[in-house]
Curated annotation (Swiss-Prot):
NCBIfam families: L31, PRK00019.1, PRK00528.1. It comes from the Bacteria. This is Large ribosomal subunit protein bL31. Its cofactor is Zn(2+). Part of the 50S ribosomal subunit. Keywords: Metal-binding, Ribonucleoprotein, Ribosomal protein, RNA-binding, rRNA-binding, Zinc. Zn(2+) binds at residues 16, 18, 37, 40. Binds 1 zinc ion per subunit. GO terms for molecular function: metal ion binding; rRNA binding; structural constituent of ribosome.
């Protein structure tokens, strides 16, 4: 490996907006602030909402039906 081309790796602490702190490594710095983490993300907490795409698909098909004929 070449000398002096690799970034410095720090022991970092990810600090989430919800207050959760995670210890990891990073090249960005010693403290990295994030907006969302696994303890507050809706996918991991089970509080995700269902997005109804059926209406959107029907509107798309209706809008572009004239081009398929």
């Amino acid at each position: 490996m070449k000398d002096n081309i690799h970034p410095t790796v720090y022991k970092a602490k990810l600090v989430c907006a919800c207050g959760n702190e995670i210890d990891t490594t990073s090249t960005k710095g010693e403290v990295v602030n994030v907006e969302i983490c696994s303890s507050c993300h809706p996918f991991y907490t089970g509080k995700q909402r269902f997005v109804d795409t059926a209406g959107r698909i029907d509107r798309f098909r209706k809008k572009y039906a004239k081009f398929s004929k």
